[in-house]
């Protein structure tokens, strides 16, 4: 500027023209940089987190490693029924009318089936509140940026229902609970944040799942109570709370009396952002196998960086929090394990002791 001010007429005109050219060139370069930056950001959304060294390498369920089991697989001295036979005979579910109303995978829980679902969630919520978790009823209609934050978008976008208002239906309360503190800076003394959230959940469940397409194993709409934690940026803290979340669900399963096992998922069967995932698998007598009913994961700062969730330490420095989540309970899937493991020869079903106060009965029968 000083050079232009002190320049003679012709020189000043030349300098002004040169500046105009530079300004135009800079504008073009900035536009090009913006395009490259946008492409880079899109590519970075596909980059996965780094699994913990303890995670087994593999892509199939057979590659998972069993950590521990609880209870003996239930055996009967009579021909046991599957959950469809049991629940239809006791008018706990109506699949035919469910399909008529909601299409493929549609269902109605009714009578004691509906009451059992309510009882399970109320019992679990009470248990988690006793442990100091703050209860939430979370929204299911969610903005896309929340799915990007959790790592569900763009990879799993085809699995999510979209509305005409550009909102999406969440398949887990992990999504809205991550968004709850989006772009906030918490105080270190506020951590850990321990939440338990109930929400209706929706998943398109694209693909052929064989036997799981029948009954209420894989459905488009279900209810879930989810555990969620934000903690300090420490691997040791993440590991500690991961074990806590998993132990909470194991305790719930033990109180329900459902035989189960805990496995650590192989690298090819954990989500994009997860560092490590445990599955809890419940014993299903009609299939003579354990099947996944809970999923417990920690992410380090993978989700919090995308969501912009930080905390300010006592030293004045800021860092991204670490996030974790785990299924506390999900219905109707857990009902399969409850009714099949508690059936009697006459087709009646014993209600787990911890659910009797919520159900008002200890057995359901015709």
Regions found by a protein language model. Name each.
Residues 1-74, 92:
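N-terminal alpha-helical targeting/anchoring segments
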Residues 69-366:
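TRNA-recognition modules of translation machinery and tRNA-sensing kinases, especially anticodon-binding
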């Amino acid at each position: 500027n000083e050079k232009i001010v002190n320049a003679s007429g012709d020189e000043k005109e030349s300098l002004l023209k040169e500046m105009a050219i530079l300004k135009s060139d800079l504008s073009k370069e900035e536009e090009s940089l913006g395009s490259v930056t946008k492409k880079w950001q899109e590519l970075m959304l596909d980059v996965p987190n780094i699994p913990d060294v303890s995670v087994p390498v593999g892509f199939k369920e057979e590659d998972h490693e069993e950590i521990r089991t609880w209870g003996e697989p239930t055996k009967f001295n009579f021909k046991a029924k599957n959950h469809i036979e049991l629940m239809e005979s006791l008018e706990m579910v109506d699949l035919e009318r469910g399909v008529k109303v909601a299409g493929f995978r549609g269902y109605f829980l009714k009578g004691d089936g509906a009451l059992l679902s309510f009882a399970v969630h109320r019992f679990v919520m009470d248990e988690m509140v006793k442990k100091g978790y703050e209860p939430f009823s979370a929204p299911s209609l969610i903005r896309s940026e929340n799915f990007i934050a959790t790592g569900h978008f763009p990879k799993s976008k085809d699995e999510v229902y979209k509305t005409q208002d550009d909102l999406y239906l969440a398949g887990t309360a992990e999504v809205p609970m991550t968004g709850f503190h989006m772009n906030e800076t918490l105080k270190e003394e506020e951590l850990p944040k321990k939440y338990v959230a109930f929400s209706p959940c929706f998943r398109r469940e694209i693909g052929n799942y064989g036997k799981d397409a029948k009954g209420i194993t894989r459905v488009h709409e279900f209810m879930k109570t989810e555990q969620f934690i934000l903690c300090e940026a420490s691997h040791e803290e993440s590991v500690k709370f991961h074990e806590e979340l998993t132990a909470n669900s194991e305790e719930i399963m033990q109180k329900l009396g459902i035989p189960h096992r805990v496995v650590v998922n192989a690298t090819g069967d954990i989500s994009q952002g997860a560092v490590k995932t445990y599955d809890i698998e419940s014993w299903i007598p009609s299939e003579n196998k354990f099947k996944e009913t809970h999923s417990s994961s920690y992410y380090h700062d993978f989700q919090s960086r995308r969501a912009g969730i930080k905390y300010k330490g006592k030293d004045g420095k800021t860092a991204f929090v670490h996030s974790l989540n785990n299924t506390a309970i999900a219905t109707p899937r857990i009902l399969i394990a409850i009714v099949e493991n508690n059936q009697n020869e006459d087709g009646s079903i014993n209600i787990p002791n911890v659910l009797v106060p919520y159900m008002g009965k200890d057995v359901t029968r015709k």
